[in-house]
Amino acid sequence: MTKYILPLILLFCSIGFLAANIIAETKINKVTGEIGILKATAEPALVYGQHKETRQYVTLEVENKGEPQSVYIQIDGIPYEQIALNSGINQIETSVPETTERKNVSLSIASGSSILAEQAVKSYPVKQWTVYMVQHSHTDVGFTKSQTEVLTDHIRYIDYVVEYCERTENEPEELKFKWLCEATWPVIEYINNRPKEQVERFIKYIKNGQIEITGMFFNMSEMIDENSLKTFLEPIRQLRALDIPVKTAMQNDVNGIAWCLADYMPDLGIHYFSMGQNDHRALRPFECPTVFKWESPSGKSSYFYRFDHYRTGNRWGISDKNATEMAPSVFAYLNNLTEKGYPFDAVSIQYSGYHFNNSPPSLVPNAVIREWNEKFASPKLRSALFHEFMDYVVERYDAQLPVIRAAYPDWWTDGFGSAARETAVSRTTHADMIATQGLLSIASAKGKPLPQGIHEKIRHIHTNLIFYDEHTFGAAGSISDPRGESSQTQWEQKSSYAWEAFKNAQVMQETAGGLIQTNMPRGGVPTVTFYNTLNWERSGVVELFINNEIIPRNRDFKLVDAIGNKLTTQLLRSNREGSHYIAYAENIPPMGYKTYRVITGEEEATPLPQLSIINNIIENDYYKIAIDTNNGSIKSLFDKDLDVEMIDSESPWLLGAFVYETLNNNRRQLEQYRLTEYTRESLVNVQVRPGHDGALYKSFFIEGDCNGVEKRSGVKIEVRLFNNEKRIELIYTTRKLPHLEPDGIYVAFPFKLDDAKLFFDVQGGTVSSGENQIEGSASDWNTVQNFVSVRNDNSQFILGSREIPLFQLGGIRTGQFQRQKTFNHPHVYSWVMNNYWTTNFRAYQEGEFSWSYYLTSTDNTSNATATRFGWASRVPLHGRVMPAGKANDYPVDYSAFSVDGENLLMTSCTPSKDSGYLLLNVRETDGKKTAFTVKDQGGKLHEFQIVNAIEEPLSDVTTSDLFAPFENKFIKLKL
C-alpha cells in the first residue's frame, strides 16, 4: 500500500503548491480582459486523465487578444493542466471529472497569480457508446462512371480487400480491416473470374470474420416483380455451395424495399436487413436510426436496421480527417441520438474508403480508429461487420424492439417515369415471363424435355430486367449535362437491358409455344389454342394475329370447341399479311389450355357497325358513360349493377383527363420538399368520334391538342366498353416533345365512393394507403404492381395499367411529402411521365408512346377479387394459331394442375432446376387460414415440398399443407 501513498502525497502537495500560488494573487488581478472563454462544451465522451482515470472530455474556444502565453486550466478552482495560448482563437481540449449526475463545473484560465477567464460548463453522466464502423463500397451500376467500368472496379476492389485483411489479421479485433460486400453481383463475378487460390484467400477472410457477404444482388427499386426476385436471390445458391455464410440483406441509397423479401429472406437464413437511406427528395422513416422487427404480411419476422446515410462516416471525416478533427461531428451525431431517445448504447455507421460512390477500400480509416481509441475511453470505435452490431443489439435488447408489420414503399421510383417507354417494356416483359415460364411448366408437365440451357436463358432475361429495374438510372450529370457523352452512353446502356430482355423473352415465348404445339389437337382445319398460365380457370379477351392463308381477308369465320360452342370474336385491323382479331376465350383451365377449330365461311364478314353516340352518352349492360367535350374526359360513369355514380364531379379533373404539368422551370423545389410553382392544363380543341359497336366491345375516341406533345398528332384516347365482361379499357397515344424543362403527364381517375380506402398491390401483398406502410415511406406516389383498389364495405373499383407503374393516391400529391399519409377523397392519378429529378434519371423523353388502363367495379370487396382482376389483366391469356394439319386424337383441353382456393395466388411457376419438378410461388391474399393441395386434371393429389427461393427444403414431402393468413411459400411440385 505504501507504494501508492507516496506518489499521492507528492501529487496533492504539488497541486496544493500550484493552487496556493494562484489563489494568493486572485485578489490582485482576476480578469485582464485580453483572454475570454467564448464557448465551453462538455462532450459525450470520456478521455483518460493523467492517472488513467476516465474523465469527461471538454472542448473550449478561447480568445487571446494579446501575445502568446502559457496558462493553466483550473477545474472548480483546482489547477489541472498547463496549456499554451496563441494569439487569436484557440481550440482547447481538456477534461473534467466523470460524474454520475448533472452539475455545473467551473472552468477557469489562470496565469501566474491571475484568473484570466472563467465559465461554467454543464457536466453530465456520459453514455458509454460503441460505434460499429462498417466499411463498404456503395454499388451504383453507373452514375459516377459508365456501367462497363463499375464491375471491373468492384472485382478489383475485392483483391484489395483480401490484401488489407491479410495485412491486419493479427491486429486486435476492433482494429482489423473489415469489409462488407454490399451486393452479391460483384462477389459472384469475382468468384467466377479469379483463380482458385485467390478465391480461397477471399473465403478465408470471410470465415475469419473480416468480410461479410450480403444477400441482395444490388440495390433494387420496387419495379421488380416477385418472379424476377428469384433470380435476384439466385447467387445465394452459389454462395451456399462454397459454405459462405449470408446473414444480412443490405439495401443502400434506395428509400424502400420489396415487402415479399420479409417472407423470402428468413427462409434463406437471412434474418438481418439494413437500409442506408438517402433522404434526397425523400422522407426518412423514424426520428433516428432504428432497429425493429420487420414482419411480412403473414407475420414472419426479421430484424431491420434503418441506418442514416450510407456514407455517414465519410461525412464525419473517417476517410480524410484525424480523430480530433472528426470528433465534433461524432459528438454532434451522438448527442442528436440521445436527444431523440435512441435506446441503445451502440450504433452502426456505414462509410466508404473515399467519399464517393463505387469507392475503393482504404486502410486510412483503420488508422483513424486506432488514433481515436487511444485518445478516447468512450465512445469506442470498432472496425466491424454489420451482423456484429445486430448480434449485439438482438442479444441485449430483443425484448424491447418494436414490431412493425408494414410495407416500405420506395420514394425514388418516380424517376422511372422519366423513361416511360422503356419502363413499360420492362413491365410488359415481367408479365410475359410469368406466362412464358408457365408455358414451359406446362410443357414439363406433359413430359416434354426442355431445350438445353433453358434455365440459363431464363436467368439471362431476368438478369437484364433486374439491371433495368435497379436504382441507378444514368449519369450523375444526366440533368445538368443531358447531351454529354456520359449521360448519353449511360442511358444507352441502361435502356439496352430492357430491350434485350424483351427481345429474348419474345423468343422464349415462341420456344415454349413450340414445345407444347406438338401435343396440340390437329385436324383438317386450322386451330387456335388458348393458354392460361395462372392458377384458376379463366375467361377473357385475347388478341390474335391470323394470316390471310388461314382466314382470308374480310372472310366470315368462327371459332368453335369440340361440341360446337362458338366464341365471340371481333376484327381489330388488317394489313396485307393478315388481320388482328380479338376473341373472348371461355373457361380456359388453370395452368393449361383449350383448343378451338377455325371454321371459315364462304361469305364476306359483316362490317363492324359504327357506334351511335347520342348526347355524348354511351352505355352497355354494365355502365353508362357521359363524355365531357370541353377537356376530353368522362364526366359520368354510372355502374348499373351497383347503382352508383363512380366519378366525383367536384374534382378539377374528371375521369380519363389527360393532365399536362410544368414546374415553371424549377425542379429544385422538390428537393425543398414542396411543389408550389406549377401549372396544369388539359386538352383543348377536343373532338369526340365514334368507334365500333362490336360484338365484344363498343368504343369511342377522344382527341385533342395539348402543350408538351406534338401538335399534328395531339392526344388520342380510345375508350372500350366490353360486352362479355364487366370491364372498361382506356388506351392513350401521344407523341411527347423533348422538353428539357421539367414537365409531367397524369391521367385522372377521381373516384367517388363513401368512406372508401385506397389499396394497391406490391410484391408480397396488398397495402392500404397510409395504413400498413411504414410512416415516412413513399406517400406522394406509389409503385403499383397490378392494381389499385378503391374500396368500402359494399363496393370496390379496381384499376390498373399494364405499362404504367406510378400512381398517386388521394389526388395529385406531388410535393406534399406527408409523413403520415391522409387523404380526403379516393381520387387516383396515374403518373405517366416526368423529368423532375436533378440527377441520375432522364432529362427528357420524346416520341410516340401508347399506354392503357383496365377498370372494373364490383360488390365483392375482397383482396382476392382485386388480385385476380389485376393479375389476369397484366398476365393475359395467350393464343396460338396453327394451320390445318394431320389429324390426331390429342385432347382439346388440358390442365397440368390446379390449386383450390380463390384466395391463393400463384405468382409464378417455373421448371425446377431438378428434372421432374416445378417451382411454384404461392401466397394467400385474404387473411384466411387455407388448406393447400395440388391436383392434376383427374383429381389426383400431387406430392410437393415446401422450399425456399433457391429450392432448399424446409419441410418433408407431403400432399397437403396449411397457409397462414397472407403467408407466402415456395412449393417444389413433383410431376
What are the roles of these predicted feature ranges?
Residues 51, 261-264, 288-290, 510, ...:
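C-terminal (or distal) subdomains of carbohydrate-active enzymes
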Residues 201-208, 258-321:
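Surface-exposed loop and adjacent secondary-structure segments within mature catalytic domains
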